[in-house]
């Protein structure tokens, strides 16, 4: 699914306008525990989270996420924006909570990219 469509479905605000959003996202993963993100996510997906610190972007980069959506209208810390620009990872803010947003995206056809296997 194209990130532009995801932003529309999320009623999202793009926080990194200088980063290209004409990219394909293959699935979604929602979590606030970054150790779970590293252990159970799959590459080329969108991370849905309530955390807004710079570590979220660093974790997303390590796990090969293509974009990050902050839930409940949260805004990232200024340093988070800087790291996202350096790593070329689009940041989006959505007014929906994690459960609602995940459901909307899944209903629209975005598959879950949560692995059921632990290391």
For the regions a language model picked out, list residue spans one by one.
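Short secondary-structure junctions
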Residues: 12-18, 112
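Compositionally biased, intrinsically disordered low-complexity regions
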Residues: 14, 29-32
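Absolute protein N-terminus
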Residues: 1-2
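Feature captures the catalytic cores and cofactor-binding loops of soluble hydro-lyases/lyases
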Residues: 22-23, 31-46, 51-119
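Histidine/lysine/aspartate-rich catalytic loop segments that bind and position anionic ligands
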Residues: 19, 26
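N-terminal intrinsically disordered, cationic/polar leader segments
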Residues: 7-8
């Amino acid at each position: 699914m194209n990130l532009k469509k995801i932003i529309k479905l999320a009623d999202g605000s793009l926080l990194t306008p200088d980063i290209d959003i004409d990219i394909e996202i293959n699935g979604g993963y929602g979590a606030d525990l970054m150790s779970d993100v590293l252990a159970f996510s799959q590459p080329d997906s969108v991370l849905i989270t309530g955390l807004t610190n710079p570590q979220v972007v660093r974790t997303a980069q390590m796990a090969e996420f293509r974009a990050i959506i902050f839930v409940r209208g949260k805004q990232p810390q200024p340093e988070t924006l800087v790291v996202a620009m350096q790593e070329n990872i689009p940041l989006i803010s959505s007014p929906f909570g994690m459960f609602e947003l995940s459901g909307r995206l899944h209903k629209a056809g975005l598959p879950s990219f949560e692995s059921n296997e632990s290391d």
